[in-house]
Amino acid sequence: MPFQQREQNGLVWFTADVLNQIPHGFSTRMGGVPPAPWDSLNLRPNQGDGPEALRENYRRFFAVLGLDEHRTVLSQQTHTANIRRVTAADAGKGVVRPRDYTDVDALITNEAALPLTVFSADCGTVLLYDPVRQAVGAAHAGWRGCAAGIVEKTVQAMEDAYGSRPADLLAALGPCIGRCCFETDGDVPAAMRDALGADAEPHMERRGVKFHVDLAGLNRQWLLRAGLAPEHIEVSGVCTACRPDLFWSHRKMGDQRGVQAAVIALKECL
């Protein structure tokens, strides 16, 4: 299986085989400390369960990934297609010191031991790795970001900043709401058609007066359009809305819920 479900000390997370050369992971809601309704591994800053519980949740998740949570850099998501190039000067922003940026839904870096963190609770997350140029990226790609082309723009940003070639990139698309549960009105399919044209059609279907949309499939389509090889892309295939016992889901829980995190980092040279 391209994605692996892992468990350690009650904490459950997913990894992708395509990224097995570097530290990375997609968290679930299992293995943290807060009480309901934030139980238990909520990684959402400034939401619900207090700073001490949040710090402990970060410590636990980053420990199983073999990473230092004090050096991670958090996105500041507003469903845009904005991308931030991260350097050591950003280390810890969002965790141990305030973020001095807003409207950032994707992060890229070519510096080691500088974990990039993006969030979701049904939206898509995409982790990227360039094993040739040694660079990584992380993108939050909900339907608005997908329609705005954030995945392709993140690939382009890595190409512009680090000389990455799309054919070299490896990508993992984490758990997100599936076609089974992502029921929408016509505005979402219309936005996808405007962005992807006929390539969007296989990932959407009409059921009565509503539409069902395959968000992961659409984000994968953007990766293919950007030039990634199909064999370099892995999709979890897990629907967050189908598994509210395992994942935070905005569709199932509304605003009273936490978030998952998707994290990626380059190894530190010893």
Task: Name these PLM-found stretches.
Residues M1-L270:
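Active-site microenvironment for binding and transforming phosphate-containing groups
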